[in-house]
């Protein structure tokens, strides 16, 4: 009889162990899944944009959106996620977490709606507030078809109190001789935000003299924001008031930390605009540290007289600085490529140290910039690279508990599957999609 009871007991335990997770925590899973949106098709992406613009995501700070496949938007007219009303206000916007999971949205043509009254801010997202966007690549173009004042950012036109990480922009921008103002960048206007581990690959060209435009590889206009561990490899041809390889205009205590630009600088005009290898214009209380510019400087269309006062290897111009020491922009451990008549910054000659391109490709330069606090990886085929980054990815909690003999891949390892360490109790297993598509697994003992 005793053996029978024991047998029944273990049979019950076995059955319970194989029940769906719902038998233990249906409410928890239901809550986690209810605010999560999965996007795998173009139609689902367009529906998500329409839902945000209709107010379905208003106030949903816990919303989680996961892009789980590459999408091709060829032939589609893009309407930004978050669009304006008739008074140019943006009443509906995204405030949750958007996980790109390393996927690419390709052939996105921003041209048709750029400059229209309905889009004072424009991009994949028009405006985000309190949001997190990560692991997203945008590939496409914008050939300006309408004049206007637009905060344009390929990922986000405006980002307030938000974080953008691990995103790549491969979008070309051409003004097509139209008169435009606003911003051009991966993130047009960053307010109280952090932009990190992002890269711009797209070439920007604005050949018309404009009155108010900030253009940067990563951020156009940075206000009380931090841009760190970012890179620009796109070329910039510009006649805009503020153009920088990383940030167009840096002001209100904003910082650029550990970034580099290797894209070509092609300044246009008579020298009445600010153009810098890292930042176009720097303001009071701002800081640039551990950065380098190693791109070509093409002066063939630049007619300013020497010495150049608004063209610099680190920063082009200075704005809003009163002369008080606390207002003075700070520069630390920065380097720029040697070009005749181009200083680090005319007003702050010690903003950076001049080097040859050949030297910047050596291990000696890598040691110099890292010993002084820069965080880079040595690159035997060129200039130093940014440290490796694992961007956030959406976590998928399965509907089953597994026992301690479940075979999975350990987090951060790509070798053969191995068994979870033995132990008493059940384990909840969650999978995370990596940049390469490998599923890494987190394990948590319940």
Can you say where each PLM-predicted feature lies in the sequence?
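Extracellular Ser/Thr-rich, low-complexity/disordered mucin-like segments
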Residues: 411-426
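Sec-dependent signal peptide hydrophobic core
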Residues: 5-13, 426, 430-433
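Intrinsically disordered, compositionally biased charged tails
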Residues: 23, 420-423, 446
